Amino acid sequence: MFPRLQAVSAPALLQITLMAVLLAPVLGDCGPPPILPFASPVIQSYETNFRTGTALKYNCHRGYWRVNSSHVICDINGSWIYNVFCAKKRCRNPGELANGKVEIITDLLFGSTIEFSCSKGYSLIGSTTSQCESQGKTVDWSDPLPECVIVKCDSPPDISNGKHSGTDEDLYTYGSLVTYVCDPNYSLLGNASISCLVANKTVGVWSSNPPTCEKVICRQPHIPKGIFLSGFGFYYTYKDTLVISCKKGYILRGSSIIHCEANSKWYPSIPTCEPNGCIDLPEVPYISWERNVLSLKNQEIFEIGSLLKYDCKTGYRPTPNEPRTVTCQENLKWAISKGCERVCCPTPNMEKMRIINERRDFTGVCVYAYEDYIFYMCDEGYYPISADGRSSCQADGMWNPKMPACESAVCLKPDILNGKLSVEKDHYTETENVTIHCDSGYEVVGPQNIICSENRTWTPEIPKCEWEVPEECKQVAAGRKLLECLPNPSDVKMALEVYKLSLEIEQLEKEKYVKIQEKFSKKEMKQLTSALH
């Protein structure tokens, strides 16, 4: 019934047949064979139902070649399965296009397209595209490479009262340039040179119309109070330029640059010089001009309405309710604000102090201002917070060093070895109480609480932190445990010395103190005996 099954190998056919027999009652059959873009069934069938295991053979379409087994098989799931078995054939490389380029859009495989284009100034003769198509048993390009030929322009036009650089024998191709010149006493109006360009990618045209040659004469303008910075003759021709300024105290109204036009007139209109504005920067006390104003420092005239901003110098501040600006008024005078005033520093609290150079005839908004200084002394029992009792008012409105003031006598931080203070700082004020806490293994010898007295000393006397000998360490005869009793493992040297001494003591004890009496005095014996017991 299915002669196409003969194309399947015998072992594969046996496996497919067995699976079909076993699974056919359980699973569904396959529908019509699949429609593949690259191949068609060898035998066309209009059946719509195929048993599991059916294998159909396909042939590759034109433009494709077989790379694998070309069978599709109905599997146990009722689906047609296959591996891609046809691949697109490849067209040859199209080569290089002189004065143009070949653009490969995707690849060189069957069905792909390449595009041709010419370089600027060249016209394309032939097809702009070519496709990789089937030609018999192989594939090749549908269209050959086109030709790119250079674009040509007609001869440039002649002009009256002038000529161009070309000759009758010249061939004008893309990029060719010709230049026009006028006869003596004539001015060239327009572009002196024109070039051969391409229109619509195929037609050669000149870049613009040729210029003309005309007689143009402009006379030097009369500008009262004006100064000519360039151009000092009496007559000028087309495109000649004048640069104009005004004398000090006058301002230019109009353009400072004018050109002689083709109609023998100046353009823009001839300017004028008028006395309009404030002269020079005004004098304002204690200010510094902003950077953009400093750039105008050499400017002689400022127009009416000119607004100049300033900052206050170091140590000065803007006068309250006054703008930090000066304005040029219609009467050609500067409207000047009150400027800046010195920065104030706060008046010191006179409690427990007196100022040696106290000011009594001050004027202004504050008692002490920038650059003022104070010498002061403190009452008995107090001292200045600045070492020399001197303080100066700074630009930021702060006293340096610190605002003049007096503090009560202080005590320095007590030095407690192997201990710490309840309050840690460098200085302590009068009547301030401090508690001493010894490190672990140490005990306070002396009062634990001390107070800063008015004479800058601590009372009672500053205590010490000494090693507290544990009960089990008081008997040193068994010196082996002595290291465990030490407060600090770094004291190994001391421990070894003590251990050595304990061994000697033990030996002396065994010898019934015979040799001890020879080596030690009665007082030393008493100390050793006490240490052993």
Curated annotation (Swiss-Prot):
Q: Which SMART domains match?
A: CCP
Q: Name one GO cellular component term.
A: acrosomal matrix
Per UniProt, subcellular location reads as: Cytoplasmic vesicle, Secretory vesicle, Acrosome lumen
Q: Which InterPro entries match?
A: C4bp_oligo, Compl-Cell_Adhes-Reg, Sushi/SCR/CCP_sf, Sushi_SCR_CCP_dom
Tissue expression remark: Testis. Not expressed in heart, brain, liver or kidney.
The residue ranges of the Sushi domain are 29-88, 89-150, 151-215, 216-275, 276-342, 343-408, 409-467
Q: Does the keyword Repeat apply?
A: yes
Any one Pfam family here would be: Sushi
Q: Which cysteines are joined by disulfide bonds?
A: 30-74, 60-86, 91-132, 118-148, 153-196, 182-213, 218-260, 246-273, 278-328, 312-340, 345-393, 378-406, 411-452, 438-465
Q: Which UniProt keywords apply?
A: Cytoplasmic vesicle, Disulfide bond, Fertilization, Glycoprotein, Repeat, Signal, Sushi
SUPFAM superfamilies from the entry?
Complement control module/SCR domain
UniProt feature coiled coil, ranges: none
Q: Fill in the subunit field for this protein.
A: Homooligomer; disulfide-linked. May contain 6-8 monomers per oligomer.
* Its biological purpose: Probably involved in the formation of the dense core and M1 domain of the acrosome. May also regulate the release of certain secretory proteins following the acrosomal reaction.
User: What is this protein identified as?
Assistant: Zona pellucida sperm-binding protein 3 receptor
